[in-house]
Regions:
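Helix-loop junctions and terminal segments of transmembrane helices
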Residues: 12-13, 42-57, 128, 243, ...
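Interfacial/gating helices of multi-pass transporter permease domains
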Residues: 14-35, 103-104, 166, 199-206, ...
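Helix-terminus/linker motif at the lipid-water interface of multi-pass membrane proteins
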Residues: 9-23, 92-95, 215-249, 267-268, ...
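Signature of the first transmembrane helix
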Residues: 1-47, 76-85, 112, 147, ...
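Interhelical loop/hinge segments that connect adjacent transmembrane helices in multipass membrane
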Residues: 101, 161-167, 178-221, 260, ...
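Interfacial segments at transmembrane-helix termini and the short loops linking adjacent helices
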Residues: 88-109, 234, 282, 299-329
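Membrane-interface junctions at transmembrane-helix termini in multi-pass inner-membrane proteins
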Residues: 115-141, 325-356
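Membrane-interface helix-loop junctions in multi-pass transport and translocation proteins
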Residues: 16-26, 129-133, 145-177, 181, ...
Length: 398
């Protein structure tokens, strides 16, 4: 597990133990809304600038492209920040049927949007110079660490409510400052000169389709939380969140291998090394199974003890953990099939899979959550991921 995941897990654990189910649920709902707004607000410019700068040879053209992406991202971030603030009351009261506290949390979390969008665009810009360390330092170490530390300070020196409101904004602002310094060091681009950036139509044209792909993935990730908030209450969301975060540990194994596996598979595909591709595919699945199985077994055999980490009031959410652990294990083992499709010339097929998964998951949540609550959301996730795994087995077999 990377440092960032450790810090995020500690954040969830301590917030659950100190703030309780209700406040954790409110934080989860506001976070889900903000993450979905963020992926729309980025306009796909993070991935777009990675491609454009990587292919550009002239340094000045690289700088102009980065300034253009930052300017468009900044404007978009401000626009979607205002939209989220304006919709905060409607979302909290009419969609989630919650108190004014959720309105406040959604509105204040919106202030982080321009900063997080700049962070992502800047981080991918540094990656385009074939330097991954700066992106990792800010997005995977500093941001989650500041989030954790700010939450602890807010809780002990202010209030439990401030611990779910302020840390997100502090983390975003400090992360933006740090990545801006790194970006200037590597590319010579000063973020204070962003007003000089020009509108790059080609960059935006390439980036927007990526945005829609990202939206599908983000919606699939947050559907359970959003729909639990719609059909139930923040306490149910608060019980569900730690179980989902814990089961997510299993998926980290998939992400770790996918980063190495993807480029290798793409290279073999270009060289038409079919037998080597088949061997690599089976080898990676074997390794993913080996490393993820112990986590899955632990969560399936000792779910009550695992949930006690978050406090006694989370104990009765252990069946949710068991179902989500099974779902995460299936995704970890068969998820590499999605990477295979992308790297072997079938990205549209993978996009179709994600679209089907979103539709299926939303439909199942509509049907199961009203009668089963958190278990309904977990069951919907299990069925969806099992279905996609089955589809990928067939597709990769061909």
């Amino acid at each position: 597990m990377g440092l960032g995941q450790v810090f995020r897990y500690l954040f969830t654990t301590l917030l659950a133990r100190w703030a309780g189910v209700e406040l954790l649920g409110i934080y989860s709902l506001a976070n889900a809304v903000t993450r979905i707004t963020e992926v729309v607000g980025k306009l796909g410019l993070d991935q777009g600038i990675l491609r454009k700068v990587s292919r550009e040879e002239n340094r000045e053209n690289k700088q102009n492209a980065i300034l253009s992406a930052l300017k468009m991202g900044s404007i978009s971030g401000l626009v979607f920040m205002i939209i989220q603030i304006a919709l905060a009351g409607w979302l909290a009261e009419d969609i989630f049927n919650q108190s004014s506290l959720l309105t406040k949390v959604i509105a204040i979390h919106a202030l982080s949007l321009p900063f997080y969008i700049i962070i992502h665009i800047s981080a991918f810009s540094t990656q385009a110079f074939k330097l991954l360390k700066y992106k990792i330092v800010v997005t995977e170490i500093q941001n989650p660490l500041i989030l954790l530390l700010a939450m602890v300070v807010c809780y002990f020196f202010y209030s439990a409510e401030s611990a779910i409101i302020i840390p997100v904004v502090i983390s975003a602002v400090l992360g933006c400052v740090t990545i801006s310094m790194f970006l200037k060091k590597i590319s010579g681009v000063n973020i204070l000169s962003v007003q000089n950036g020009k509108f790059d139509r080609d960059l935006l044209t390439y980036s927007l389709p990526i945005m829609f792909i990202s939206i599908l993935g983000t919606v699939l990730h947050w559907t359970d939380v959003i729909m639990l908030g719609y059909f139930t209450d923040s306490a149910t969301v608060g019980l569900y969140h730690p179980a989902a975060r814990t089961a997510g540990i299993i998926r980290i194994v998939l992400l770790s291998f996918a980063g190495i596996y993807g480029p290798l598979m793409a290279e073999m595909y270009v060289k038409k090394q079919t037998s080597e591709m088949n061997h690599l595919f089976k080898l990676v699945i074997r390794w993913i199974t080996t490393f993820s199985l112990p986590f899955a077994i632990l969560m399936l055999i000792y779910p009550k003890k695992v949930m006690l980490i978050f406090g006694g009031e989370f104990l009765h959410a252990y069946p949710i953990l068991m179902v989500l652990a099974a779902a995460a294990f299936i995704q970890a083992v068969f998820g590499i099939g999605g990477t295979t499709l992308n790297m072997t010339g079938f990205p549209k097929m993978n996009l179709l899979n994600t679209f089907i998964a979103c539709g299926l998951n939303i439909g199942l949540n509509f049907y199961l959550i009203p009668t089963m609550g958190g278990m309904g959301a977990a069951t919907a996730t299990l069925i969806t991921l099992s279905f996609i795994a089955f589809i990928r087995i067939i597709q990769n077999g061909k």
